[in-house]
Amino acid sequence: MLNLKKLLSKTLEEIADLKAAPSGIDAVVQQGTSGNSNYRVWNNGTVEVWGVVNANCNEMSSFATGLYRIAKELSFAILGTLGVTTITSEQFSVRTTGGSGYATVWSAYIDASNKAHIQVVGSNANAGTVAIDYYIVGTKS
């Protein structure tokens, strides 16, 4: 049985590697990397793209939304290059290391309007590394 706490601490990239192939899929016909992204194309036309985009910044809460948009555009560009015509699922998450180890992250999430939020407290709380993890599945026609 999977340890839920252990699973929740993994990045989306690691989770993508743990996922079993959907039923009816039995072979990867193409796989590789493009920039920060990894991708797999399955024999039934299913395409997976996952990875992480991160950056150091002085204003984590305001910078996170821009970084999320970059992650989304990069991953969708790869899907387009691979011939994907339909997005069947997309997962994005935001995380941070906090400000030089002196900040506490209260919450980090992406809301329904595609705005990333990071709430931190502590000295130098606004400075640190922001990371956007993503896992997207689409289909080729």
Description of each model-found segment:
Residues 1-54:
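Glycine-rich, low-complexity segments
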Residues 46-141:
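Extracellular attachment/recognition segments
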